[in-house]
């Protein structure tokens, strides 16, 4: 089956829905394809305890706020309900179960192939998300470990781990919250942390930390970090006393230079201070019977490891190598990316900014010169 449209959006998560809404507002005909059988599929697959680490006021998509009564930090299920409402509000009906296999530019037109369907469009907006393909460390000994080894994308809750020794590898925002969840379900938890990091509180003086980040975003990153540092240190404390190493640069500089976000602490550090979560070094290798060898040569035995080791976009599956960089001139030849930039002002807020810009740029290119 062949379909023709002005703009094709790939992905029906927050970024794809936001782009669809903005295109709808601008009167641009579009279609959305999604490989899963539902919108917001990645959110539906997240662990049960997940809440937004950014507040609802700065996390709504364009033109529609979260419903009244939603708590400051919405739960996974509340975000899913919001995405469903968002799609219905803007009349967005994606083509579901459409795995995009190839996107090619031919004679000034984008040809997108998905199974037996071919989409021809003037513009393509890739909105498949930064967290598409789980990253799994290639540690020696994985084949003989003999214990449960799962990625955070496969983790649901800590019920099955009660009374067990569980290692969470990685201390990003997923790793920090999963460690809390395991503790709350009665597991004995340790964190494997190799890299230095920044830790920021979720709130400062009762205000969401994102509000401060947005206020400081117009300043040079190092100056913004210098202004925020005293408050952050006052609230977070000295993480070196917990066996953690602080990055030499502040959190805003970290995001701008590495595209990696700091840990937004929602209670992990308190559990470390209370001795309920141990902090260990990086993992060197796995061994028989659940043995884990760490960078310092020490060996400990665990019943399970949760890999909170991140994701990669996986765009090479359907984009030619020269198109995968997500760099260059935005909208060049009609190709756009939404939801891949890590912003100090919040991922969902950034998606909204990008979606508006993309829609406006498409409209401007359609006007007579």
Region locations from a protein language model:
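Flavin (primarily FAD) cofactor-binding/catalytic cores of flavoenzymes
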Residues: 2-36, 40-42, 71-173, 177-207, ...
């Amino acid at each position: 089956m062949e379909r023709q449209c002005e703009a094709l959006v790939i992905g029906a998560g927050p970024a794809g829905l936001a782009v669809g809404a903005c295109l709808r507002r601008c009167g641009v005909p579009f279609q959305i394809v999604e490989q899963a059988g539902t919108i917001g599929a990645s959110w539906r697959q997240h662990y049960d305890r997940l809440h937004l680490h950014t507040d609802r006021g700065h996390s709504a998509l364009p033109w529609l706020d979260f419903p009244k009564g939603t708590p400051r930090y919405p739960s996974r299920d509340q975000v899913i309900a919001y995405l469903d409402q968002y799609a219905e509000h803007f009349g967005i009906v994606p083509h579901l179960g459409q795995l995009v296999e190839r996107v090619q530019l031919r004679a000034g037109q984008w040809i997108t192939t998905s199974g037996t369907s071919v989409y021809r469009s003037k513009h393509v907006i890739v909105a498949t998300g930064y967290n598409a393909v789980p990253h799994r460390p290639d540690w020696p000994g994985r084949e003989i470990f003999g214990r449960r080894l799962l990625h955070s994308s496969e983790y649901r809750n800590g019920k099955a781990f009660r009374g067990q020794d569980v290692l969470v590898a990685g201390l990003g925002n997923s790793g920090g919250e999963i460690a809390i969840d395991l503790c709350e379900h009665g597991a004995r938890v340790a964190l494997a942390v190799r890299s230095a990091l920044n830790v920021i509180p979720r709130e400062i003086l009762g205000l969401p930390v994102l509000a401060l980040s947005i206020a400081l975003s117009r300043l040079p990153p190092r100056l913004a970090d210098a202004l925020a540092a005293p408050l952050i240190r006052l609230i977070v404390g000295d993480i070196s006393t917990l066996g953690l190493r602080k990055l030499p640069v502040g959190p805003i500089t970290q995001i701008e230079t590495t595209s990696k976000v700091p840990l937004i602490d929602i209670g992990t550090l308190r559990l470390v201070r209370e001795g309920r979560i141990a902090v260990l070094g990086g993992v060197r290798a796995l061994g028989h019977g659940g043995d884990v060898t760490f960078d310092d040569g020490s060996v400990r035995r665990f019943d399970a490891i949760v890999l909170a080791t991140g994701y990669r976009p996986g765009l090479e599956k359907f984009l030619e190598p020269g198109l995968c960089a997500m760099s260059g001139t935005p909208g060049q030849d009609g190709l756009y990316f939404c939801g891949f930039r890590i912003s100090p002002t919040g991922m969902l807020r950034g998606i909204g900014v990008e979606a508006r810009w993309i829609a406006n740029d498409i409209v401007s290119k359609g006007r007579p010169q």
